[in-house]
Swiss-Prot record:
SUPFAM superfamilies: Influenza virus matrix protein M1. Residues 1-164 are annotated as: Membrane-binding. It comes from Influenza A virus (strain A/Swine/Tennessee/24/1977 H1N1). Homodimer and homomultimer. Interacts with NEP. Binds ribonucleocapsid by both interacting with genomic RNA and NP protein. May interact with HA and NA. Cannot bind NP without genomic RNA. It holds the Pfam family Flu_M1. This is Matrix protein 1. Most abundant protein in virion. When expressed alone can form virus-like particles in transfected cells. Residues 165-252 are annotated as: RNP-binding. GO terms for molecular function: RNA binding; structural constituent of virion. Belongs to the influenza viruses Matrix protein M1 family. One of its GO terms (cellular component) is host cell nucleus. Its main location: virion. Keywords: Host nucleus, Membrane, RNA-binding, Viral matrix protein, Virion.
Length: 252
């Protein structure tokens, strides 16, 4: 796996699924391929994206700044600086300085990542802030190692939280989660359907599913009534893809 592929993988792992994630993936690909060279416009676009947490925006801004060539005196962006200040915690800043000194001795991406993984996400963000604010310099490879370690820490805690939700025995939370998943699956089906004749069928199934979820929420239904809703939808989607000559079995 190439270095940039690895960076893209880690960064995208902390972005919530949805149309915005696809858009960010495209921007990262363009930036890494050298196709997008207007850092100012890129940062302005990032700043105004909804849904993303300030820290995720800060990490993306840091990655864009590392990758896109820019004039020497280009102003640092406040939204990135604020996100990478470790919540203003002096403890994070002390650890960030110690980590920075260790990173100065590293020359490889993997070496930097290994060193960084023993620190908390707050200290890692502060260390990125030091580098972003030009208070310290490391090689791009080492900076990317720091980015990936930070993303791994964040993704780990997101995964723990997600696992808690998936394994919860609370029927109301499970019911709502199934309805949310069915609704987002239906939305994805509508986006994929396009305008062919068979597409009308897929659109109809998706539309009915969304109406059903809406009705279930409006009138309040038994928690078990949503069981299998998403799987039914995915079966419909796969049947539609088969007719279109597309074989994708890994949606589940």
């Amino acid at each position: 796996m190439s270095l940039l592929t690895e960076v893209e993988t880690y960064v995208l792992s902390i972005v919530p699924s949805g149309p915005l994630k696809a858009e960010i993936a495209q921007r990262l690909e363009d930036v890494f391929a050298g196709k997008n060279t207007d850092l100012e416009a890129l940062m302005e676009w990032l700043k105004t994206r909804p849904i993303l947490s300030p820290l995720t925006k800060g990490i993306l801004g840091f990655v864009f700044t590392l990758t896109v060539p820019s004039e020497r005196g280009l102003q640092r962006r406040r939204f990135v600086q604020n996100a990478l200040n470790g919540n203003g915690d002096p403890n994070n800043m002390d650890k960030a300085v110690k980590l920075y000194r260790k990173l100065k001795r590293e020359i490889t991406f993997h070496g930097a990542k290994e060193v960084a993984l023993s620190y908390s996400a707050g200290a890692l963000a502060s260390c990125m802030g030091l580098i972003y604010n030009r208070m310290g310099t490391v090689t791009t490879e080492v900076a990317f190692g720091l980015v990936c370690a930070t993303c791994e820490q964040i993704a780990d805690s997101q995964h723990r939280s997600h696992r808690q939700m998936v394994t919860t025995t609370n029927p109301l939370i499970r019911h709502e989660n199934r309805m949310v998943l069915a609704s987002t699956t239906a939305k994805a089906m509508e986006q994929m359907a396009g305008s062919s004749e068979q597409a009308a069928e897929a659109m109809e199934v998706a539309s009915q599913a969304r109406q059903m979820v809406q009705a279930m929420r409006t009138i309040g239904t038994h928690p078990s009534s949503s069981a299998g809703l998403k799987d039914d939808l995915l079966e419909n989607l796969q049947a539609y893809q088969k007719r279109m000559g597309v074989q994708m079995q890994r949606f589940r």
